[in-house]
């Protein structure tokens, strides 16, 4: 992940699917990635990071990484996030991820998609992602979100979005998508 965020595409992947049983460490791994990306070069001195960097063949963790986190057990599409705090109301995973990645500028690209609950596709997702810095998207407990909204037909929209997001991220040299689902 750190190699890809650093812009290296050889022997790297842009998309990771972590699948283990409950209690298998998925959320802990996502938390590690979050702190590495959020703290950039400050994380170089954290215990164990030197080994990660050595194995990756890197001098340090890249700085200025845009990070977004979607947790399916926490996000509620009926109430959404924002709206009462001076930020736009966000009722979809793509609206929330866009907001976290680039604030109003990124959200503007998917605002209509969010309002109409229509998943964005490649060109729109590409505009939503920051172009000038590394980008890490973490998605945890996705199946919980899917099962909650299955009766509304929203689960297919999330699957379609994740597929389009995966393809868009693969086309970037410094973007990574990491998702977790229980085995």
Label for each model-derived stretch:
Residues 4-15, 21:
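Phosphate-binding P-loop
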Residues 41-53, 156, 172-174, 179-183:
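Phosphate-handling catalytic cores of nucleic-acid transaction enzymes
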Residues 62-67, 133-134, 172-175:
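Short glycine-/polar-rich loops that comprise or flank the Walker A/P-loop
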Residues 97-100, 124-131, 156-177:
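Substrate-engagement module of ASCE P-loop NTPases
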Residues 145-158:
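Conserved ATPase-coupling elements of RecA-like P-loop NTPase cores
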């Amino acid at each position: 992940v750190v190699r890809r965020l650093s812009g290296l595409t050889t022997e790297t992947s842009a998309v990771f699917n972590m699948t283990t049983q409950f209690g298998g460490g998925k959320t802990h791994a996502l938390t590690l990635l979050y702190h590495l990306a959020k703290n950039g070069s400050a994380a170089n001195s954290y215990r164990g990071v030197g080994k990660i960097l050595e194995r990756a063949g890197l001098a340090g963790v890249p700085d200025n990484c845009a990070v977004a986190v979607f947790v399916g057990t926490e996000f509620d599409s009926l109430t959404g996030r924002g709206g009462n705090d001076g930020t736009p109301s966000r009722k979809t995973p793509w609206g929330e991820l866009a907001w976290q990645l680039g604030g109003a500028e990124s959200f503007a690209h998917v605002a209509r998609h969010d309002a109409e609950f229509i998943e964005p596709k490649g060109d729109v997702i590409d505009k939503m992602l920051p172009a000038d810095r590394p980008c890490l998207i973490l998605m945890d407990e996705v199946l919980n979100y899917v099962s909650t909204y299955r009766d509304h037909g929203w689960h297919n929209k999330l699957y379609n979005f994740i597929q389009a997001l995966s393809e868009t991220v693969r086309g970037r040299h410094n973007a990574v998508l990491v998702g977790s689902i229980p085995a």
